[in-house]
Amino acid sequence: MAASFDYRQPVGRGSYVGLGVNLMRDAAGISNFNRQTGAISASVMRQLGGGRYSSTDQFLVAGAQVGIGQQGFEWNQLWFSSQYDVANAAVNFDNPNGEAFINNMSDLYVDFNAGIMWYALFDERQSFYIGGALHHLNSPNITFLDQTNELPTRWVAHLGGELPIGDELSLLPAAAVMGQNQSLSTTGGVNFRYTNREWREIALRAGAWAHVVNQLESGFSLDAITATAILEMEEWNLGFSYDITTSTLTNANNGRGAFEVSLIYTHPAKSRRARVNCPNF
């Protein structure tokens, strides 16, 4: 479960500052492994081109984020090899697990992130963006034990855009690549966006996305496929997605994927002059 809020304020001709808040909680598995984070962010946005004498709007955005986090799990819901009773061929939870768990939660840690993005809008339904970010710049310690377990810095690169096909249909391709130590993850796909002038501010999106990861022993493999559907309204976006597991993880989740719902509200600008053109994601 996640929630976020952001606010933009003009600070001169073609320049803006932004503030944001992000909250997230995630839990999974029989051990209820959970993670909760909260962060505040600040950004600077500068118009590089466009306006009265150019049909192409270009913007450069840079931002930084600082937050706190904590992780936890219920280790008493797990069993370890030292608890397996060979004589009875069963697990005996009364036996010590041999692990040095101090508590169910890690200490609170501070986390720093930063990123940058450039985008251009060539027409009402034609745009391109590219950006990158670094997460966990300070490599916070997330251990459950009385020792050091640093979270490595993760880098992200992403790009995408919108390409019109006729008067009512357009393509929204995008891709994101993430790396952390030896791990590499890539997500890419496309949404089809349909709108009709009679619908005014309403549009429909549907698409598919593939998630590819590197297996250290067997190379790259397809981990999951995601189907998406989004209803765009004047101020609201309502989205649905379903992840279909395609890797060997199906042995653990019985082939069941994850269903997600998203709801986005965009407060309308006070005037047309205060509106900032942004690409469709």
Where are the regions that the model predicts?
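Subset of outer-membrane beta-barrel
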Residues: M1-F281
